[in-house]
């Protein structure tokens, strides 16, 4: 669904149609963005009181102070920080930690991705705007000092790792808290043995059903969250009217002061539970690409925020009139629910917790995909669960890892106290990272004064540092979990990024010069067989070493050679007309081309049967529109994109489809994987034919005809299977990272053939040893 398509843009902003579409998007965002924050009333007060740091007294200072803290935290963090400020810092409509990092890196040239990625992006893809950032001390320091660039990358990766940790903890906390309502209807001995198995069964079902995709039941998410918000707000209004109509007085900041003055250290430590009221706030920014700023703002300010405030006020009103709780762990959501409607509310709560968990799981898949696109995570299998809904992906390896970790923490802790301590640290760390990166965006991208940026950093940073310190104190009571998880994922990301960088440097240093190709003649000194050979390379210029290694050991190759370079660039999306760059290597008679295919870090590289067709048609269009100098060729030694041409639209080719008889094993490698449970279509054989255009030059038509014949003969994918080893004399840490860490990840990750979704029968791997 194109939420920002031409139809919406064509209508006048502020008109009836515009408001109608924004309202529809706001309603849809409830099920995707706000499931997690909507489920927070299930466990916020319980987490604040369950630790034993504060006790509910007859004077109600504790519950009033907790309500005041919840209200002002909700007002300042999600409403003031995210809705009013952070949502404006979009990267071509996309949000999230990597969006902020990408904005900063493109503006000040401080990225640590290989140089070719920046060059491949091109100025025309820079969504940050054409205005140059003014020279400042901060910008100069970032561009000059490599250490600051590494710290910036580590900061972005830290936020990403904590989001992944949140993906482990949120399902456990939400589902366990929702199911805990059963304890009010059972004996103490019964619910002790019932809650954990039921929670684990729900979690297993949740993760086991991920490969089916959410598009079949996604239409239910928004109604469920909407029903849940209406339910908790109505219950809140009832409790306010029935138990304590004057509870609104606790919204005054004065009650925060009374709370902290009375409880002192205990009250400060209880802030780790209070901060859970803003869990899920980061999703407003991370999911910006699926909706619009106005729709997300509308949903939060008009429905989510009022409903949550009423829910927390209602719980506080009930608790303020009841002081006979056995301990703090019994102060929770369900005690304030009237007994007659407790079972229906329990059912809605479980559904709402599942929706909130689904949102964070899907978000984790998207983040892993972004990291993999930017060479910060090993290549993983990405399955597109929907052929129509953008961004609906499923990563099997990550899904099962999340399930195992989620079940482990649930069974290991067995209560919400330790789980919420762990979740709180993950949530507040992500917010701190966003605050730090956002202050740099204000200074470097928005060109505001340093006073404005520091004001934002100090105000919101001070609030979040207080909560961060309160959460970190609970390190031995569960907060060690997100730290451990983020450390493991951080090590994986850093090792993979470092190894990939060293591999690229090796390729650059060992590439073959263009003169070597020219000296061996058009036949390349080998037998040229029918078909197209795609040679995968990370280089944008020169001849990769795997090609010379291949022809030295196997002196035969295809009649048409294509050096294919697939790049994920530091912009969220690349338009289809800007995706292909095509050039020629050597004279025309060599029939060697270079194609660079560019994807944004948010682009979904679908398992599309059209990829090969688009590739061939782009080369054909390049041949047709070649320069008048027929013997010109791209300078392979150049470090720029000189010689490459944008192919906005490939040459239209006529197709004839027929049954594939299976006699040609190197035939069309068209392959599409949408869902492993769908029946694969019967393979087809596609015959390409040139359009009947009499204006095409005879020599050009001959080259095009040869390209079509080669495509019909089949297409093979040749890639290097490099074995990385540290050079003798390298440091101990480098040897461990390269010889063991990176090699282990490489052996257990997907090969580059998965980037273009070619079947194994069309792939040839060339082994090489790379000494770095």
Swiss-Prot record:
Its main location: membrane. Residues 1-23, 88-150, 214-216, 287-298, 366-392, 445-449, 499-772 are cytoplasmic. Residues 45-66, 172-192, 238-265, 320-344, 414-423, 471-477 are extracellular. The chain crosses the membrane at residues 24-44, 67-87, 151-171, 193-213, 217-237, 266-286, 299-319, 345-365, 393-413, 424-444, 450-470, 478-498. It is found in: Membrane. Residues 656-684 are annotated as: Disordered. One of its GO terms (biological process) is potassium ion transport. Pfam families: K_trans, K_trans_C. High-affinity potassium transporter. Belongs to the HAK/KUP transporter (TC 2.A.72.3) family. This is Potassium transporter 24. It comes from Oryza sativa subsp. japonica. The gene is HAK24.
